[in-house]
């Protein structure tokens, strides 16, 4: 066992003495040391209940013959950090989480790891750490919250609240009506109830093979969620005995499976960023062009909030992730022989799955569309690509030609949109919000929600080198690479320039002559902003482009 290096031999007497002070006995030194990476934190509703989850996992580990050691990692609530300077810290927190888990596990030579995440950057941060460490690992998330409901019974969620702010600013809703939404949108603990980033990543954990079935869809308040935690604690000891490590489970085919599910279920566009980062940590080269190839052959089988009235509880009732995977397997779209933490292949895991509600999960012969819910666009604005959640775009604006209205920060954009600077037919351009330029690649949920709340969702497009919340809907193209701060062409767009966005044909073009384009690029000097935070300055220096997953490079570029 890895842990023998800290518990075997007379040289380790001081180490054992310290471990005895933690309550260990001679018998414990014969057992595997299991780390429990818990992301419990009081200020994130998706994490407030994780303290008891960790206790369930620890008890199960002990009963199965392991020694559990719980430690905590930080977390950021993207909803609370949204729309102000706090969002600069969201994506960088992913790297801190990965680094901190690596630090604890390697410093103490733990044999295996149970990860208890739930919300946006915590899930990918933990998966990145697992890929880096390459030890036996299992994930059990805290689960989604239930959808909220208005007094008339209509389902709502956090995205409803953000969009309502835009409606109030335009006089389409009263503040009293907004208050009713505020008080009902988030009714319980758990990750926000739609197919937003957190739930997307927890669902993808199933197809990656690192979580047990149900991890993505069973509600946080469902007793089955606690049973899932207990099973995870038992299973991690079996994984140690089987010596099944992360990279034995996750390879290039597994990443392909993940993108296939992601595209079929209409996952958050942030998943592209995170899956690329996970692939990078696992030593897998996965170009963004390959994502679009997968999207073109993968049908859209689900449309959950923000693309419809359905939420995670509906997905769970309809058969969960296993039912979606079973449908995809009928078309030969998955690598079914990949191993999983259940010690079964993916094909064996989903063998008995079936759709229980074809309105929530469409059968493979009757998809929403024959192509996927995520698309990667290329063109002179985005030579390295841009990502759009096509499943959440109104059909009326899948192809849009409009005049640019440019902003150099999210704050400028919010002021301009709510101040009436943006009109029907425009293309909003928000730049200097990329990984390096932001820094931190902030989510543009407030600007997009303002557009939707003002009734312009089928009349205005938005492009940015930043990213979007999983709650975003509309013609919103993010992750434009290279970013403006790195000299990307998005930085040369001027107010009034015509832009063509053609999602079906995967194009995004600045409609100026080649000569004018070349001239602007030659004269372009990216803006530099003062970054007061020492951490964010370091992050800005070392972070890579969105098409590489916005991971930190080994050297300053």
Curated annotation (Swiss-Prot):
Reaction equation(s) it catalyzes: (2R)-2,3-dihydroxy-3-methylbutanoate = 3-methyl-2-oxobutanoate + H2O; (2R,3R)-2,3-dihydroxy-3-methylpentanoate = (S)-3-methyl-2-oxopentanoate + H2O
Chain positions recorded as [2Fe-2S] cluster binding sites: 119, 192
Pathway info: Amino-acid biosynthesis; L-isoleucine biosynthesis; L-isoleucine from 2-oxobutanoate: step 3/4; Amino-acid biosynthesis; L-valine biosynthesis; L-valine from pyruvate: step 3/4
BP-aspect Gene Ontology terms: isoleucine biosynthetic process; L-valine biosynthetic process
Top-rank EC class of the record's enzyme: lyase
Molecular-function GO terms, alphabetical: 2 iron, 2 sulfur cluster binding; dihydroxy-acid dehydratase activity; magnesium ion binding
List of residues binding Mg(2+): 78, 120-121, 443
Family indicated by similarity: Belongs to the IlvD/Edd family.
Organism lineage string: Bacteria, Pseudomonadati, Aquificota, Aquificia, Aquificales
Requisite cofactors: [2Fe-2S] cluster; Mg(2+)
GO terms for cellular component: cytosol
Cited InterPro entries: Dihydro-acid_dehy_C (IPR042096), DihydroxyA_deHydtase (IPR004404), DiOHA_6PGluconate_deHydtase_CS (IPR020558), ILV_EDD_C (IPR056740), ILV_EDD_N (IPR000581), IlvD/EDD_N (IPR037237)
Cofactor info, note text: Binds 1 [2Fe-2S] cluster per subunit. This cluster acts as a Lewis acid cofactor.
Function as written in the Swiss-Prot or TrEMBL entry: Functions in the biosynthesis of branched-chain amino acids. Catalyzes the dehydration of (2R,3R)-2,3-dihydroxy-3-methylpentanoate (2,3-dihydroxy-3-methylvalerate) into 2-oxo-3-methylpentanoate (2-oxo-3-methylvalerate) and of (2R)-2,3-dihydroxy-3-methylbutanoate (2,3-dihydroxyisovalerate) into 2-oxo-3-methylbutanoate (2-oxoisovalerate), the penultimate precursor to L-isoleucine and L-valine, respectively.
Residue list for modification N6-carboxylysine: 121
Active site residues of this protein: 469 (proton acceptor)
Family matches, as Pfam families: ILV_EDD_C (PF24877), ILVD_EDD_N (PF00920)
Binding partners and assembly: Homodimer.
UniProt name for this protein: Dihydroxy-acid dehydratase
Key words of the record: 2Fe-2S, Amino-acid biosynthesis, Branched-chain amino acid biosynthesis, Iron, Iron-sulfur, Lyase, Magnesium, Metal-binding
Native source species: Persephonella marina (strain DSM 14350 / EX-H1)
EC number: 4.2.1.9
Domain of life: Bacteria
HAMAP family linked to this entry: IlvD
């Amino acid at each position: 066992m890895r842990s023998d290096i800290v518990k075997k031999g007379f040289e380790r007497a001081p180490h054992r003495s310290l471990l005895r002070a933690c309550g260990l006995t001679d018998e414990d030194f014969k057992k595997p040391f299991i780390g429990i990476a818990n992301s419990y934190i009081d200020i994130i509703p998706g994490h407030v209940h994780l303290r008891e989850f960790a206790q369930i996992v620890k008890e199960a580990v002990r009963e199965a013959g392991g020694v559990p050691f719980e430690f905590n990692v930080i977390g950021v609530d993207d909803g609370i950090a949204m729309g102000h300077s706090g969002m600069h810290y969201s994506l960088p927190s992913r790297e801190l989480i990965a680094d901190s888990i690596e630090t604890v596990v390697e410093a103490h030579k733990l044999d295996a790891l149970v990860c208890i995440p739930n919300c946006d950057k915590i899930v990918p941060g933990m998966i990145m750490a697992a890929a880096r460490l390459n030890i036996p690992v299992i994930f059990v998330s805290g689960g989604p919250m239930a959808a909220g409901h208005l007094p008339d019974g209509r389902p709502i969620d956090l995205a409803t609240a953000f969009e309502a702010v835009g409606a109030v600013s335009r006089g389409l809703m009263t503040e009293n009506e907004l208050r009713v939404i505020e008080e009902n949108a988030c009714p319980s603990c758990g990750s926000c109830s739609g197919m937003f980033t957190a739930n997307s990543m927890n669902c993808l954990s199933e197809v990656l093979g690192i979580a047990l079935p149900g991890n993505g869809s069973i509600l946080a308040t469902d007793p089955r969620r606690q049973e899932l935690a207990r099973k995870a604690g038992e299973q991690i000891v079996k994984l140690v005995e089987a010596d099944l490590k992360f990279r034995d489970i996750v390879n290039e085919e597994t990443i392909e499976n993940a993108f296939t599910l992601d595209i079929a279920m209409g996952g958050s566009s942030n998943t592209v960023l995170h899956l690329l980062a996970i692939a990078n940590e696992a030593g897998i080269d996965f170009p963004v062009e390959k994502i679009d190839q997968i999207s073109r052959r993968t049908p859209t089988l689900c449309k959950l909030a923000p693309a419809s009235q359905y939420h995670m509880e509906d997905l769970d009732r309809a058969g969960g992730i296993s039912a979606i995977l079973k449908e995809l397997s009928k078309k030969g779209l998955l690598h079914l022989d990949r191993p999983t933490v259940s010690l079964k292949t993916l094909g064996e895991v989903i063998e008995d799955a079936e759709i229980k509600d074809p309105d929530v999960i469409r059968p493979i012969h009757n998809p929403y569309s024959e192509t996927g819910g995520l698309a990667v666009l290329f063109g002179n604005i985005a030579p390295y690509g841009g990502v759009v959640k096509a499943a959440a775009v109104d059909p009326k604006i899948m192809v849009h030609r409009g005049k640019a209205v440019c902003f150099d920060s999210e704050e400028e954009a919010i002021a301009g949109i709510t101040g009436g600077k943006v009109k029907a037919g425009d293309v909003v351009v928000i730049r200097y919000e990329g990984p390096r330029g932001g820094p931190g690649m902030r989510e543009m949920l407030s600007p997009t929600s303002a557009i939707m709340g003002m009734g312009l969702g089928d009349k205005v497009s938005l492009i940015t080198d930043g990213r979007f919340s999983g709650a975003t809907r509309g013609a919103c193209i993010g992750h434009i690479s290279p970013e403006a701060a790195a000299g990307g062409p998005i930085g040369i767009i001027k107010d009034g320039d015509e832009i063509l966005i053609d999602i079906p044909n995967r194009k995004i073009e600045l409609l100026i002559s080649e000569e004018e384009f070349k001239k602007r690029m030659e004269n372009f000097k990216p803006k530099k902003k003062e970054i007061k935070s020492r951490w964010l300055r370091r992050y800005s220096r070392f972070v890579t482009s969105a098409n590489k997953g916005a991971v930190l490079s080994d050297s300053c570029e």
